[in-house]
């Protein structure tokens, strides 16, 4: 097989990688904030907040990410009469999706904390917020870290679906090259290998984190 096509395709995919990482990092960052709030509400006594979090999670988990992207790109801008770039829509979709799954991670991490931590905080004269900040959140975050990193890996993979709304991430760049060069087989083979390498690196990093936390 003539490998000269990689001279053009690889730079395109690396250019797409920049946007993929940007969308995944910003999306998971916003998703972490959303997920942390919803995760707290899910195990709290605030019935209204808990209900809102449950409805949000239900909607996100019961609809495909690609459908959400299409709705966000083609429908929402018309409803609000504002132009929204595909990149912003992509970040929003990744944020909302990761937030829904992170909320369950956070809920599990908080519920896994020894109830005695709250009693310890009270005995030390700490307020509820101080107890949460100093005695509950640190161990909860530590226990949730492997699952959070796994969600980041999932978000990186999910960015490939954003090619449906013309986000110039890795997959969209490969699709553009395949359409122009008529080299579908080598192009998509290279794309698969490219993702395999990138995600394998992230999986190795995740395993290292898990090993250090044992």
Language model: regions and residue ranges:
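Transmembrane alpha-helices and adjacent helix-loop boundaries
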Residues: 1-214
